[in-house]
C-alpha cells in the first residue's frame, strides 16, 4: 500500500501525467519516476504520445505545442519497461494517436504490455492534430475519425478471439489472430474527446473518456452528449469512466480545489500534470507529487 493517496481507499483514482517533455532521454529517470509515484500511492501513470515532431525551420509558421526538439518516449515501449519495475501502477496511454498507427500492430503491442504487466494497461486513444506526423507515418490525416471506430472494433476482437475475420471499409483481416492474448479481454479503451463527433464516438465505443475541457457548463454539455450517444448504442452511461486533469501550479490548496471540482463533475479518475510548472529534474517533479500525495485527501 502506498504512502499517500492510494492508501486512502476512496473510489476516485488519482494518477499522474508522466512529464514526457521534461525528463529527456534518461532511462534512470523513467524508472525512478515510475517507482516513486507508485510508492506515493498514485493509482496510475498516464503518458502522452507523439512519434515525431515537426521541424519549425522546414514548416514555416509552425504553431504546434511540440516540435522536433520536444522529448517523447514511445508509450507502449516505455510501459513494457515500467511493467518490470512496478507492481501495482496502472499504465495508461492518454492518448495514443491511433489512426496514424496500424490497428493490428497496436493490438499486438497492447496485448503484450497487458500480459507483461499482468493486466495493468488502459489504452486511451485519440485522433491527434499533427498532419506532419501522419505524413511521416504514411497514414491519411483527413479520414482519421472514420478509421478510428473500425480500429477499436477490430482490436477488441483481436484481444478476445483466437482467430478473426474482419472486412471493414478501411481494415481487412482474413483468419488471423494474436498469440498470446492479453490478460484483460478486452483491454479497456478510453477516448480523448472535445468535438461533438469525438464525444459521440466516446459514448458509442469507449469504456471511458478524457475530456478536453475543465469542469463547468462545457463539460456538462459534453457529458450529456456522451451519455445520449451511449444510450443510443444500448450502453449504460454510468458505466463509462471519465478522467479529469489537475494542473500543478505549486499550490496544494489549488490542486485540492481542482480535485473537488472534478469529483463534483462526476469524474472517476484524475491525473496530476506537473509539466509546465518550471520543474527541472525528476526529483523536482517527484517532490511536487509528494506534496500532493501528502496533503490531498480524496
Regions found by a protein language model. Name each.
Residues 1-298:
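Active-site-adjacent structural elements that line small-molecule/cofactor binding pockets in enzymes
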